[in-house]
């Protein structure tokens, strides 16, 4: 779990991993506006923060169902392909379920996020407020049946509109 001492370290990690500062600014804004649900870090054996992920609330057709959006997910380049992102995501999913969050969405590469169990959100009748590439908007039921009987447009926290 993110600790106060991790905030600036996470900011530096995100700025080093992504092409622009947009993700770092997003995380800072979500944190400042209390729109983050879960923020986890992965550390090296030496205690260096080498990975980070964050979840924030989303709505379906303007209604809160305790669903979450995963963004961003980052691992330092020299630590990639070692299962760090997988561990972060699995730990996060377990924590989200423990706290009563039954479903999650993500916007990203289907081949990558499919490894974690995400499927095209359209299979669940869900769409994103933004125009995104086919298959990039994905969803997962953390609790079986959580998305059943729901359909419509997913909106992220307002901070995402600044990306």
Report the location of each language-model feature.
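C-terminal "cap" of GNAT-fold acetyltransferases
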Residues: 3, 127-163
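Short loop segments at secondary-structure junctions
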Residues: 44-47, 78, 141-146
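Conserved active-site alpha-helix within GNAT-family acetyltransferase domains
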Residues: 98-102, 107-133
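A conserved beta-turn-beta hairpin within the catalytic core of GNAT-like acetyltransferases
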Residues: 58-70, 80
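Conserved acetyl-CoA-binding loop-helix of GNAT-fold acetyltransferases
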Residues: 70, 75, 81-94, 105-106
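Active-site rim helix/loop that mediates acceptor-substrate recognition in acyltransferases
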Residues: 7, 15-59
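A short beta-loop-alpha structural element at the N-terminal edge
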Residues: 1-10
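Conserved glycine-rich acetyl-CoA-binding loop
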Residues: 48, 76-87, 99, 115-116
């Amino acid at each position: 779990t993110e600790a106060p001492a991790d905030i600036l370290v996470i900011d530096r990690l995100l700025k080093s991993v992504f092409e622009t500062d947009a993700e770092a600014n997003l995380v800072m804004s979500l944190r400042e506006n209390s729109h983050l649900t879960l923020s986890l870090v992965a550390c090296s054996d030496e205690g260096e923060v080498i990975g980070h992920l964050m979840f924030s609330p989303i709505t379906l057709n303007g209604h809160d169902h305790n669903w979450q959006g995963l963004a961003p997910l980052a691992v330092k380049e020299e630590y990639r392909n070692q299962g760090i992102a997988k561990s972060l995501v699995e730990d996060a999913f377990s924590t989200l379920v423990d706290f009563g969050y039954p479903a999650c969405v993500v916007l990203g590469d289907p081949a990558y996020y499919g490894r974690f169990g995400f499927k095209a959100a359209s299979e669940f009748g869900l769409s994103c407020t933004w125009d995104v590439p086919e298959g990039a908007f994905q969803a997962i039921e953390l609790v079986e049946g959580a998305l059943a009987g729901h359909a419509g447009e997913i909106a992220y926290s307002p901070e995402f509109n600044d990306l």
